[in-house]
């Protein structure tokens, strides 16, 4: 609450101009977004959001961090798409067409989150868990995940795989990779194999564009062509891999999705 007040004061924003406070959390919420049911990375269960926001004197909205990033990425993408339209009528026809604009967002962070947006709407599922791609099994009886299960996508492609588990930072890992350190090359090849396996699974299931964001993504951009080639090899039908891309939003822009 004090941090919120400090930010508002520092930027000379009047209280009446504050629309609200958005809070992003890496966890699963209930259907009303009033309780954080489970956050594996934070080790929290059934935490009432009201406890988090009670001292903040503004309207608050808490949401899953990956969904917030996905929202921001979607609107950022649409903003530039709309710049190519000739007039308002073109935009209205596009919005009213009902044509699918399916987009899956995968966030590579300390954990691995996901979100699915179709026809400008975030798909939430029956239990508000749609998009928990990080807990899709890619190696049965494999590595232990923070959720307590084994073989999860997250256990193989989170930032920890390339940093904490290698006793280095992401910067140091990719520096060693550029220096052709054999150990780091082996880890990275395994990482890309697991990453493309998961992305291919998502594409097979949902047949929509897949966007990868989060702290790890910027380090992977130089390998985009290699990743697409691997995706082409793994896909059962015809594709050139162009359905895959990296997020365009910066971390600061992504915050607007909350």
Regions found by a protein language model. Give the residues of each.
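Glycine-rich phosphate-binding loop and adjoining helix at the ATP-binding site
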Residues: 1-11, 17-21, 27-104, 221-234
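Charged, glycine-enriched surface loops/patches
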Residues: 231-245
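Adenine-nucleotide phosphate-binding core of ATP-dependent small-molecule kinases
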Residues: 1-15, 155, 163-222, 242-254
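Short glycine-rich anion-binding loops that position phosphate/pyrophosphate groups of nucleotides
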Residues: 26-29, 109-111, 216-217
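Glycine/GP-enriched mid-protein hinge/lid loop-to-helix segment characteristic of carbohydrate kinases
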Residues: 1, 54, 61-63, 72, ...
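Short, basic and Ser/Thr-rich N-terminal targeting/leader segments
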Residues: 17-19, 108-110, 240
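Conserved residues at the C-terminal ends of beta-strands
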Residues: 24, 139, 213
């Amino acid at each position: 609450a004090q941090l919120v007040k400090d930010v508002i004061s520092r930027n000379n924003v009047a209280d009446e101009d504050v629309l609200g406070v958005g809070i992003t959390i890496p966890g699963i919420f209930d259907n009303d977004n009033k309780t954080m049911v489970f956050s594996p990375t934070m080790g929290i269960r059934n935490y009432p959001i009201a406890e988090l926001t009670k001292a903040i004197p503004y309207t608050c909205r808490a949401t899953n961090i990956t969904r917030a990033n996905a929202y921001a990425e979607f609107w950022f993408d649409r903003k530039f798409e709309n710049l190519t339209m000739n007039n308002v009528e073109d935009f209205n026809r596009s919005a009213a067409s009902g044509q699918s604009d399916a987009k899956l967002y995968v966030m590579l962070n300390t954990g691995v989150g996901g979100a699915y947006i179709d026809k400008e709407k975030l798909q939430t599922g029956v239990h508000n868990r749609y998009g928990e791609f990080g807990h899709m099994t890619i190696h049965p009886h494999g590595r232990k995940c923070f959720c307590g299960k084994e073989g999860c996508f997250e256990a193989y492609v989170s930032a920890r795989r390339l940093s904490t588990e290698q006793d280095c930072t992401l910067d140091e890992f990719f520096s060693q990779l550029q220096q052709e350190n054999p150990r780091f090359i082996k880890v990275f090849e395994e990482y890309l194999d697991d990453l493309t396996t998961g992305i291919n699974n998502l594409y097979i299931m949902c047949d929509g564009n897949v966007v990868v964001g989060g702290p790890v993504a910027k380090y992977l951009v130089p390998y985009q062509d290699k990743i697409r080639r691997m995706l082409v090899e793994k896909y059962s039908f015809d594709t050139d891999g162009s359905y895959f891309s990296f997020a365009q939003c910066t971390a600061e822009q992504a915050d607007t999705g909350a």
